[in-house]
């Protein structure tokens, strides 16, 4: 086929006959049932999950939350779905929502949330789910016996089998306003950074990008959702679907292609393992002139597996000191900045001192503003400031 001669051009079909179908609209009685549950709730909650990048959809979700005075939870695995600095945003986006806050709800509206069943189970444990549940999702289309890609089957007192962007305006029109006092949220920690950490990296980055339109294409596992606010549907694009290592650079370059010329700077904050497994995507970015910035939160380890190996060692009575074996990326050290330069990108680092962090990031931002690709190797302390397995934040090694 590759060597075959090209014959006459075929007649091109009328593409208007192959359009995507219109979104399904749920039955009115189901909308009214859901609206009644929400309107009469004592403490409604919204799980804002997989939604579109539409600004109209973003505004509709805000309007619905404000009309209901509902607490809103967002997921660090999915793209920005609600302004995280809004008074109704219950807690920083996380892999697992705050179970106590969720248990306070008597009605839960799940907007295509990833693993609603697992989230409710984590909040209520073995007890019956104490809240009425309204599901808005098209997940049931993939339910079958062959696989379990769709996670557990959650309870649903009303199921609107449509996309959230379709359901939210219908609910907004049908619900009655609720009067409720908005509870204040605890302030984020203002402790001074004493070493280069992911938190220090986030603070320096936030200061330097204040007022800029930035799209975060990827965040590392140790990122705490409180580190940066999301105020637009393109502020954050979510995590890779399966949690695989190596997606970060490619996701960043792909986002840079999609947003080229938009005025929004694409930034991927990735781990060193993620960068090492996918860094050849940089060549595509430099070849096609797709400006973007990759900040490598480099803890010199596949650290998530160090945590797993530590837990297994404790459970089996084995030496915890061996947790690094097969995971530590050291001896020899890898020059990540040189790997970037080898592909035509600017490479900065390794940045090991706190005093060099902000100037290095400032230089990197200037490269990207000039239309270049830049990578900064930031040597962060090992450890996570965010729970990644349903438990407490992980200790440093």
Each model region followed by its residue ranges:
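Conformationally flexible catalytic loops at phosphate/diphosphate-handling active centers
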Residues: 1-40
